[in-house]
Protein backbone atom coordinates (compact mmCIF):
# COMPACT_ATOMS: atom_id res chain seq x y z
CA UNK A 1 0.00 0.00 0.00
CA UNK A 2 1.31 3.46 -0.88
CA UNK A 3 0.76 6.11 1.75
CA UNK A 4 0.12 9.67 0.54
CA UNK A 5 2.54 12.50 1.16
CA UNK A 6 2.54 14.24 4.53
CA UNK A 7 3.82 17.80 4.90
CA UNK A 8 5.46 19.20 8.03
CA UNK A 9 7.46 22.31 8.86
CA UNK A 10 10.57 22.89 10.97
CA UNK A 11 13.15 25.54 11.80
CA UNK A 12 16.08 23.23 11.12
CA UNK A 13 16.13 20.06 9.03
CA UNK A 14 19.23 17.94 9.57
CA UNK A 15 19.97 15.23 7.01
CA UNK A 16 22.06 12.44 8.50
CA UNK A 17 22.37 11.41 12.16
CA UNK A 18 26.10 10.76 12.38
CA UNK A 19 28.44 12.54 14.82
CA UNK A 20 27.92 15.77 12.92
CA UNK A 21 24.18 15.58 12.37
CA UNK A 22 23.01 14.39 15.76
CA UNK A 23 25.24 16.90 17.55
CA UNK A 24 23.88 19.69 15.35
CA UNK A 25 20.31 18.58 16.07
CA UNK A 26 20.83 18.36 19.83
CA UNK A 27 22.57 21.75 19.97
CA UNK A 28 19.83 23.37 17.91
CA UNK A 29 17.24 21.86 20.23
CA UNK A 30 19.10 23.22 23.25
CA UNK A 31 18.93 26.67 21.66
CA UNK A 32 15.15 26.51 21.40
CA UNK A 33 14.80 25.72 17.71
CA UNK A 34 12.31 23.28 16.24
CA UNK A 35 14.48 20.50 14.81
CA UNK A 36 13.85 17.53 12.54
CA UNK A 37 16.59 14.92 12.12
CA UNK A 38 16.32 12.52 9.18
CA UNK A 39 18.33 9.27 9.13
CA UNK A 40 18.08 6.48 6.56
CA UNK A 41 20.04 3.83 8.46
CA UNK A 42 21.04 3.98 12.13
CA UNK A 43 21.39 6.81 14.65
CA UNK A 44 25.03 7.57 15.24
CA UNK A 45 25.93 7.10 11.59
CA UNK A 46 28.90 5.19 10.25
CA UNK A 47 31.14 6.25 13.13
CA UNK A 48 29.13 4.75 15.97
CA UNK A 49 27.66 1.80 14.08
CA UNK A 50 30.25 0.61 11.58
CA UNK A 51 33.46 2.61 11.95
CA UNK A 52 35.10 4.46 14.83
CA UNK A 53 33.48 2.65 17.74
CA UNK A 54 33.30 -0.97 16.53
CA UNK A 55 36.84 -0.79 15.15
CA UNK A 56 38.18 0.52 18.46
CA UNK A 57 36.30 -2.19 20.33
CA UNK A 58 37.91 -4.84 18.14
CA UNK A 59 41.31 -3.15 18.44
CA UNK A 60 40.98 -3.35 22.23
CA UNK A 61 39.74 -6.94 22.28
CA UNK A 62 42.38 -8.22 19.86
CA UNK A 63 45.02 -6.33 21.83
CA UNK A 64 43.96 -7.99 25.08
CA UNK A 65 44.11 -11.41 23.45
CA UNK A 66 47.53 -10.77 21.96
CA UNK A 67 48.98 -9.25 25.14
CA UNK A 68 47.80 -12.21 27.20
CA UNK A 69 49.60 -14.61 24.90
CA UNK A 70 52.81 -12.59 24.54
CA UNK A 71 53.83 -11.50 28.04
CA UNK A 72 56.58 -14.04 28.73
CA UNK A 73 59.10 -11.24 29.28
CA UNK A 74 57.02 -10.18 32.29
CA UNK A 75 56.84 -13.74 33.58
CA UNK A 76 53.30 -14.28 32.36
CA UNK A 77 52.67 -17.46 30.35
CA UNK A 78 49.25 -17.96 28.80
CA UNK A 79 47.55 -19.34 25.73
CA UNK A 80 44.22 -17.49 25.55
CA UNK A 81 41.20 -19.14 23.97
CA UNK A 82 39.60 -16.54 21.70
CA UNK A 83 35.92 -16.81 20.77
CA UNK A 84 35.53 -14.33 17.93
CA UNK A 85 31.74 -14.61 17.88
CA UNK A 86 31.59 -13.57 21.54
CA UNK A 87 34.06 -10.78 20.81
CA UNK A 88 31.79 -9.46 18.06
CA UNK A 89 28.77 -9.73 20.39
CA UNK A 90 30.61 -7.63 22.97
CA UNK A 91 31.48 -5.08 20.30
CA UNK A 92 27.85 -4.95 19.19
CA UNK A 93 26.76 -4.38 22.79
CA UNK A 94 29.03 -1.35 23.03
CA UNK A 95 27.57 0.00 19.79
CA UNK A 96 23.99 -0.59 20.94
CA UNK A 97 24.61 1.24 24.21
CA UNK A 98 26.00 4.30 22.44
CA UNK A 99 23.47 4.48 19.62
CA UNK A 100 20.61 4.01 22.06
CA UNK A 101 22.02 6.89 24.07
CA UNK A 102 22.09 9.11 20.98
CA UNK A 103 18.43 8.46 20.28
CA UNK A 104 17.47 9.20 23.89
CA UNK A 105 19.49 12.43 23.94
CA UNK A 106 17.86 13.61 20.73
CA UNK A 107 14.38 12.99 22.09
CA UNK A 108 15.27 14.60 25.43
CA UNK A 109 16.26 17.76 23.57
CA UNK A 110 13.05 17.91 21.58
CA UNK A 111 14.45 16.64 18.28
CA UNK A 112 11.86 15.12 15.94
CA UNK A 113 13.33 11.89 14.55
CA UNK A 114 12.33 10.65 11.10
CA UNK A 115 13.55 7.46 9.43
CA UNK A 116 13.96 7.66 5.68
CA UNK A 117 16.08 8.89 2.79
CA UNK A 118 16.02 12.65 2.27
CA UNK A 119 16.62 14.71 -0.85
CA UNK A 120 16.06 18.35 -1.70
CA UNK A 121 12.75 19.19 -3.36
CA UNK A 122 13.22 22.96 -3.64
CA UNK A 123 14.86 25.93 -1.97
CA UNK A 124 13.10 25.25 1.33
CA UNK A 125 11.84 21.68 1.06
CA UNK A 126 13.06 18.15 1.63
CA UNK A 127 11.36 15.02 0.38
CA UNK A 128 11.78 12.02 2.67
CA UNK A 129 11.10 8.55 1.30
CA UNK A 130 10.27 5.92 3.91
CA UNK A 131 11.61 2.45 3.20
CA UNK A 132 12.16 0.98 -0.22
CA UNK A 133 8.85 -0.76 -0.83
CA UNK A 134 6.32 1.99 -1.35
CA UNK A 135 5.78 2.90 2.28
CA UNK A 136 5.17 6.51 1.35
CA UNK A 137 6.96 9.81 1.64
CA UNK A 138 6.65 13.19 3.27
CA UNK A 139 7.70 16.75 2.58
CA UNK A 140 9.54 18.78 5.20
CA UNK A 141 9.54 22.54 4.81
CA UNK A 142 12.53 24.13 6.55
CA UNK A 143 13.98 27.52 7.36
CA UNK A 144 17.50 26.08 7.43
CA UNK A 145 18.97 22.74 6.38
CA UNK A 146 22.15 21.03 7.57
CA UNK A 147 23.64 18.39 5.28
CA UNK A 148 25.55 15.73 7.21
CA UNK A 149 25.23 12.63 5.06
CA UNK A 150 28.77 11.39 5.72
CA UNK A 151 30.79 9.14 3.45
CA UNK A 152 30.98 5.61 2.09
CA UNK A 153 33.86 3.27 1.23
CA UNK A 154 35.51 3.73 -2.16
CA UNK A 155 35.19 0.67 -4.37
CA UNK A 156 38.15 -0.48 -6.44
CA UNK A 157 37.29 -1.57 -10.00
CA UNK A 158 37.16 -5.34 -10.09
CA UNK A 159 36.31 -5.64 -6.39
CA UNK A 160 32.55 -5.41 -5.84
CA UNK A 161 31.56 -5.25 -2.17
CA UNK A 162 28.58 -7.43 -3.04
CA UNK A 163 30.84 -10.35 -3.92
CA UNK A 164 31.30 -12.84 -1.09
CA UNK A 165 35.09 -12.83 -0.58
CA UNK A 166 35.35 -9.04 -1.00
CA UNK A 167 34.84 -7.05 2.20
CA UNK A 168 34.59 -3.42 3.17
CA UNK A 169 35.51 -2.34 6.69
CA UNK A 170 31.92 -2.66 7.91
CA UNK A 171 31.67 -6.27 6.76
CA UNK A 172 35.10 -7.13 8.11
CA UNK A 173 34.19 -5.91 11.59
CA UNK A 174 31.05 -8.05 11.61
CA UNK A 175 32.72 -11.41 10.85
CA UNK A 176 31.91 -13.97 13.54
CA UNK A 177 34.40 -16.41 12.02
CA UNK A 178 37.92 -15.48 10.99
CA UNK A 179 39.49 -16.43 7.68
CA UNK A 180 42.88 -18.09 7.75
CA UNK A 181 44.28 -15.41 5.45
CA UNK A 182 43.38 -11.95 4.22
CA UNK A 183 44.70 -9.52 1.64
CA UNK A 184 44.08 -5.91 2.61
CA UNK A 185 44.09 -3.47 -0.29
CA UNK A 186 45.26 -0.13 1.08
CA UNK A 187 47.86 0.86 3.64
CA UNK A 188 46.14 3.97 4.95
CA UNK A 189 44.71 4.38 8.44
CA UNK A 190 41.75 2.02 7.94
CA UNK A 191 43.88 -0.68 6.35
CA UNK A 192 46.56 -0.42 9.02
CA UNK A 193 44.14 -0.42 11.96
CA UNK A 194 42.30 -3.48 10.68
CA UNK A 195 45.45 -5.31 9.58
CA UNK A 196 46.63 -5.00 13.18
CA UNK A 197 43.35 -6.38 14.53
CA UNK A 198 43.35 -9.45 12.31
CA UNK A 199 47.06 -10.15 12.67
CA UNK A 200 46.71 -10.13 16.46
CA UNK A 201 43.85 -12.61 16.12
CA UNK A 202 46.03 -15.00 14.14
CA UNK A 203 45.02 -14.20 10.56
CA UNK A 204 47.79 -14.32 7.93
CA UNK A 205 47.63 -10.71 6.67
CA UNK A 206 49.09 -9.24 3.49
CA UNK A 207 48.83 -5.50 2.77
CA UNK A 208 48.94 -4.37 -0.87
CA UNK A 209 49.54 -0.64 -1.29
CA UNK A 210 49.83 1.35 -4.52
CA UNK A 211 52.21 3.92 -3.01
CA UNK A 212 55.70 3.29 -1.65
CA UNK A 213 54.79 3.12 2.03
CA UNK A 214 52.02 2.96 4.61
CA UNK A 215 50.12 5.92 6.06
CA UNK A 216 51.03 8.33 3.25
CA UNK A 217 49.62 11.36 5.09
CA UNK A 218 52.37 11.02 7.70
CA UNK A 219 56.13 11.32 7.46
CA UNK A 220 58.39 8.30 7.49
CA UNK A 221 59.51 8.97 11.07
CA UNK A 222 55.89 8.58 12.20
CA UNK A 223 55.04 5.63 9.96
CA UNK A 224 58.25 3.67 10.58
CA UNK A 225 57.48 2.43 14.13
CA UNK A 226 54.01 1.35 12.98
CA UNK A 227 55.39 -0.62 10.05
CA UNK A 228 58.11 -2.21 12.20
CA UNK A 229 55.55 -3.35 14.76
CA UNK A 230 53.24 -4.63 12.02
CA UNK A 231 56.06 -6.70 10.55
CA UNK A 232 56.74 -8.13 14.01
CA UNK A 233 53.09 -9.22 14.04
CA UNK A 234 53.70 -11.08 10.78
CA UNK A 235 52.02 -8.62 8.40
CA UNK A 236 53.51 -8.86 4.90
CA UNK A 237 53.76 -5.63 2.89
CA UNK A 238 53.87 -5.17 -0.88
CA UNK A 239 54.26 -1.61 -2.17
CA UNK A 240 53.94 -0.08 -5.62
CA UNK A 241 51.16 -2.49 -6.58
CA UNK A 242 47.58 -1.73 -7.62
CA UNK A 243 45.09 -4.55 -7.06
CA UNK A 244 43.01 -5.00 -10.20
CA UNK A 245 41.17 -8.35 -10.06
CA UNK A 246 40.47 -11.56 -8.20
CA UNK A 247 39.54 -15.08 -9.25
CA UNK A 248 38.11 -18.12 -7.47
CA UNK A 249 40.23 -21.18 -6.76
CA UNK A 250 39.55 -24.49 -5.05
CA UNK A 251 41.21 -23.21 -1.87
CA UNK A 252 39.99 -19.60 -1.83
CA UNK A 253 40.77 -16.77 -4.20
CA UNK A 254 43.75 -15.26 -5.99
CA UNK A 255 44.15 -11.48 -5.92
CA UNK A 256 46.12 -10.01 -8.82
CA UNK A 257 47.98 -6.71 -8.51
CA UNK A 258 50.17 -4.91 -11.03
CA UNK A 259 53.02 -2.43 -10.77
CA UNK A 260 53.33 0.70 -12.91
CA UNK A 261 54.96 -1.34 -15.70
CA UNK A 262 52.10 -3.81 -15.77
CA UNK A 263 54.02 -6.66 -14.17
CA UNK A 264 51.57 -8.74 -12.15
CA UNK A 265 51.87 -10.36 -8.73
CA UNK A 266 49.37 -12.91 -7.43
CA UNK A 267 48.33 -13.43 -3.81
CA UNK A 268 46.46 -16.52 -2.63
CA UNK A 269 44.02 -15.69 0.15
CA UNK A 270 40.65 -16.52 1.67
CA UNK A 271 39.27 -12.97 1.93
CA UNK A 272 40.15 -9.57 0.52
CA UNK A 273 39.41 -6.36 2.41
CA UNK A 274 39.31 -3.18 0.33
CA UNK A 275 40.27 -0.14 2.40
CA UNK A 276 41.44 2.56 0.01
CA UNK A 277 39.52 5.45 1.55
CA UNK A 278 36.07 6.98 1.68
CA UNK A 279 34.07 9.34 -0.53
CA UNK A 280 31.42 11.90 0.49
CA UNK A 281 27.76 11.03 -0.01
CA UNK A 282 26.32 13.98 -1.91
CA UNK A 283 25.05 12.24 -5.04
CA UNK A 284 21.75 11.15 -3.48
CA UNK A 285 20.59 14.59 -2.35
CA UNK A 286 19.20 16.07 -5.60
CA UNK A 287 21.38 19.13 -5.03
CA UNK A 288 20.23 20.77 -8.26
CA UNK A 289 16.86 21.40 -6.63
CA UNK A 290 18.45 23.75 -4.11
CA UNK A 291 21.08 25.25 -6.42
CA UNK A 292 24.15 23.49 -5.04
CA UNK A 293 26.94 21.72 -6.91
CA UNK A 294 29.65 19.64 -5.24
CA UNK A 295 33.31 20.33 -5.96
CA UNK A 296 35.64 17.93 -7.76
CA UNK A 297 35.98 15.88 -4.56
CA UNK A 298 32.22 15.52 -4.25
CA UNK A 299 32.05 17.91 -1.29
CA UNK A 300 30.11 21.09 -0.64
CA UNK A 301 32.23 24.20 -0.20
CA UNK A 302 31.56 26.03 3.06
CA UNK A 303 32.67 29.17 4.88
CA UNK A 304 33.82 29.73 8.48
CA UNK A 305 30.22 29.24 9.67
CA UNK A 306 29.76 25.91 7.81
CA UNK A 307 27.42 27.72 5.40
CA UNK A 308 27.33 26.68 1.74
CA UNK A 309 26.82 28.96 -1.26
CA UNK A 310 23.09 28.76 -0.51
CA UNK A 311 22.36 31.05 2.43
CA UNK A 312 20.10 28.71 4.40
CA UNK A 313 21.94 25.43 3.71
CA UNK A 314 24.89 24.29 5.82
CA UNK A 315 27.23 21.33 5.29
CA UNK A 316 29.26 19.55 7.95
CA UNK A 317 31.45 16.51 8.40
CA UNK A 318 32.63 14.34 5.52
CA UNK A 319 30.56 16.24 2.93
CA UNK A 320 32.40 19.48 3.81
CA UNK A 321 36.06 20.28 3.03
CA UNK A 322 38.81 19.09 5.34
CA UNK A 323 39.78 15.81 6.97
CA UNK A 324 37.11 13.15 7.52
CA UNK A 325 37.09 13.17 11.32
CA UNK A 326 34.11 12.55 13.58
CA UNK A 327 35.15 15.20 16.11
CA UNK A 328 35.57 17.78 13.34
CA UNK A 329 32.04 16.96 12.19
CA UNK A 330 30.68 17.37 15.72
CA UNK A 331 32.27 20.79 16.16
CA UNK A 332 30.99 21.89 12.76
CA UNK A 333 27.53 20.71 13.81
CA UNK A 334 27.67 22.80 16.98
CA UNK A 335 28.81 25.88 15.06
CA UNK A 336 26.13 25.48 12.36
CA UNK A 337 23.39 25.17 15.00
CA UNK A 338 24.65 28.20 16.90
CA UNK A 339 24.91 30.33 13.75
CA UNK A 340 21.35 29.40 12.78
CA UNK A 341 20.18 30.36 16.28
CA UNK A 342 21.87 33.75 15.97
CA UNK A 343 24.70 32.97 18.36
CA UNK A 344 28.27 34.18 17.68
CA UNK A 345 30.15 31.13 16.40
CA UNK A 346 32.83 30.32 13.86
CA UNK A 347 35.05 27.43 12.87
CA UNK A 348 38.76 27.37 13.72
CA UNK A 349 40.76 24.49 12.32
CA UNK A 350 44.21 25.37 13.65
CA UNK A 351 44.06 22.79 16.45
CA UNK A 352 42.03 19.87 15.10
CA UNK A 353 43.67 16.66 16.36
CA UNK A 354 43.81 13.39 14.47
CA UNK A 355 44.56 9.88 15.69
CA UNK A 356 45.32 6.51 14.16
CA UNK A 357 44.72 3.53 16.47
CA UNK A 358 47.51 1.35 15.17
CA UNK A 359 50.16 -0.30 17.34
CA UNK A 360 51.76 2.01 18.31
CA UNK A 361 49.15 4.75 18.09
CA UNK A 362 49.56 8.03 16.22
CA UNK A 363 48.30 11.41 17.42
CA UNK A 364 48.83 14.70 15.61
CA UNK A 365 47.63 18.28 15.91
CA UNK A 366 48.52 21.57 14.28
CA UNK A 367 51.52 22.09 12.00
CA UNK A 368 54.47 19.87 11.20
CA UNK A 369 57.93 21.38 10.97
CA UNK A 370 57.65 21.59 7.17
CA UNK A 371 54.15 23.10 7.38
CA UNK A 372 55.38 25.74 9.81
CA UNK A 373 58.32 26.69 7.60
CA UNK A 374 56.04 26.89 4.55
CA UNK A 375 53.79 29.32 6.43
CA UNK A 376 56.69 31.64 7.21
CA UNK A 377 57.52 30.57 10.75
CA UNK A 378 61.04 29.84 11.96
CA UNK A 379 60.25 26.46 13.53
CA UNK A 380 62.06 24.94 16.47
CA UNK A 381 61.50 21.26 17.23
CA UNK A 382 61.79 19.25 20.42
CA UNK A 383 61.46 15.48 20.77
CA UNK A 384 61.35 12.95 23.55
CA UNK A 385 61.59 9.18 22.96
CA UNK A 386 59.30 6.83 24.85
CA UNK A 387 62.19 4.47 25.54
CA UNK A 388 63.39 7.15 27.97
CA UNK A 389 60.00 7.26 29.70
CA UNK A 390 59.78 5.29 32.93
CA UNK A 391 56.05 4.80 32.55
CA UNK A 392 56.33 3.62 28.94
CA UNK A 393 58.93 1.06 29.96
CA UNK A 394 56.70 -0.23 32.76
CA UNK A 395 53.89 -0.86 30.26
CA UNK A 396 56.12 -2.83 27.93
CA UNK A 397 55.38 -0.39 25.11
CA UNK A 398 58.20 2.07 24.53
CA UNK A 399 58.28 2.52 20.75
CA UNK A 400 57.96 6.02 19.33
CA UNK A 401 58.31 9.59 20.52
CA UNK A 402 56.66 12.95 21.14
CA UNK A 403 57.63 15.83 18.86
CA UNK A 404 56.57 19.44 19.41
CA UNK A 405 56.91 22.27 16.89
CA UNK A 406 57.01 25.92 17.93
CA UNK A 407 57.88 29.32 16.52
CA UNK A 408 61.42 30.04 17.69
CA UNK A 409 60.95 33.81 17.99
CA UNK A 410 57.71 33.85 19.99
CA UNK A 411 57.82 30.38 21.52
CA UNK A 412 54.19 29.75 20.58
CA UNK A 413 53.37 26.08 20.13
CA UNK A 414 52.37 25.35 16.52
CA UNK A 415 51.97 21.60 16.35
CA UNK A 416 52.75 18.16 17.71
CA UNK A 417 53.32 14.69 16.28
CA UNK A 418 53.17 11.66 18.55
CA UNK A 419 53.71 8.01 17.79
CA UNK A 420 53.66 5.69 20.75
CA UNK A 421 51.50 4.37 23.61
CA UNK A 422 48.27 6.32 24.20
CA UNK A 423 49.19 8.89 21.54
CA UNK A 424 45.48 9.46 20.85
CA UNK A 425 45.02 10.64 24.44
CA UNK A 426 48.29 12.54 24.85
CA UNK A 427 47.70 14.77 21.84
CA UNK A 428 44.73 16.47 23.53
CA UNK A 429 46.97 18.37 25.96
CA UNK A 430 48.99 19.82 23.11
CA UNK A 431 45.84 20.67 21.16
CA UNK A 432 44.61 22.66 24.16
CA UNK A 433 48.00 24.37 24.38
CA UNK A 434 47.79 25.47 20.74
CA UNK A 435 44.17 26.61 21.14
CA UNK A 436 45.10 28.74 24.17
CA UNK A 437 48.21 30.24 22.57
CA UNK A 438 50.57 28.52 24.99
CA UNK A 439 54.33 28.71 24.59
CA UNK A 440 57.00 26.07 24.96
CA UNK A 441 57.80 27.56 28.34
CA UNK A 442 54.17 27.14 29.42
CA UNK A 443 54.22 23.43 28.58
CA UNK A 444 57.71 22.86 29.99
CA UNK A 445 56.95 24.62 33.27
CA UNK A 446 53.70 22.72 33.87
CA UNK A 447 54.38 20.01 36.45
CA UNK A 448 53.30 16.61 35.14
CA UNK A 449 52.56 13.59 37.32
CA UNK A 450 55.36 11.03 37.61
CA UNK A 451 55.49 8.39 36.35
CA UNK A 452 53.12 9.02 33.45
CA UNK A 453 53.26 9.00 29.69
CA UNK A 454 52.20 12.66 29.68
CA UNK A 455 55.60 13.64 31.05
CA UNK A 456 56.89 13.09 27.52
CA UNK A 457 55.10 16.25 26.34
CA UNK A 458 56.83 18.30 29.03
CA UNK A 459 60.17 16.71 28.21
CA UNK A 460 59.74 17.41 24.48
CA UNK A 461 59.03 21.08 25.23
CA UNK A 462 62.12 21.22 27.44
CA UNK A 463 64.14 19.67 24.63
CA UNK A 464 62.98 22.37 22.22
CA UNK A 465 64.12 24.97 24.77
CA UNK A 466 67.50 23.28 25.08
CA UNK A 467 67.31 22.16 28.69
CA UNK A 468 65.87 18.63 28.62
CA UNK A 469 66.86 16.54 31.63
CA UNK A 470 66.06 12.98 30.55
CA UNK A 471 67.36 13.09 26.98
CA UNK A 472 70.35 14.68 25.27
CA UNK A 473 69.88 18.28 24.19
CA UNK A 474 70.52 19.56 20.69
Curated annotation (Swiss-Prot):
It comes from the Archaea. Disulfide bonds join 47-52. The keyword Zinc does not apply. Its cofactor is FAD. InterPro entries: Class-I_Pyr_Nuc-Dis_Oxidored, FAD/NAD-bd_sf, FAD/NAD-binding_dom, FAD/NAD-linked_Rdtase_dimer_sf, Lipoamide_DH, Pyr_nuc-diS_OxRdtase, Pyr_nucl-diS_OxRdtase_dimer, Pyr_OxRdtase_I_AS. Keywords: Cytoplasm, Disulfide bond, FAD, Flavoprotein, NAD, Oxidoreductase, Redox-active center. It catalyses: N(6)-[(R)-dihydrolipoyl]-L-lysyl-[protein] + NAD(+) = N(6)-[(R)-lipoyl]-L-lysyl-[protein] + NADH + H(+). GO terms for biological process: 2-oxoglutarate metabolic process; pyruvate metabolic process. Its EC number is 1.8.1.4. It is found in: Cytoplasm. The active site is a redox-active disulfide bond. Homodimer. This is Dihydrolipoyl dehydrogenase. The lineage of its organism: Archaea, Methanobacteriati, Methanobacteriota, Stenosarchaea group, Halobacteria. The gene is lpdA.
Amino acid sequence: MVVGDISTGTDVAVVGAGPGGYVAAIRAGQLGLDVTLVEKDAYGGTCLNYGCIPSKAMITASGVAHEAGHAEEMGVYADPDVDVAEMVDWKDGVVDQLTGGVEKLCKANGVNLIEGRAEFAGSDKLRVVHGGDGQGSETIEYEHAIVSTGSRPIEVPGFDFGDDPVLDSRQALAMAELPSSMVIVGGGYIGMELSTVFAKLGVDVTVVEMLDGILPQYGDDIARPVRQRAEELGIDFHFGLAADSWTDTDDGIVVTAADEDGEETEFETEKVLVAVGRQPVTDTLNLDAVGLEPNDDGRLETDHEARTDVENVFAIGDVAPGPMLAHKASKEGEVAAEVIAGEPAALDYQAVPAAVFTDPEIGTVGLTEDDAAAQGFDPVVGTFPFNASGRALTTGHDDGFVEVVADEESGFLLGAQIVGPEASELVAELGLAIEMGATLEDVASTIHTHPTLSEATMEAAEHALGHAVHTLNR
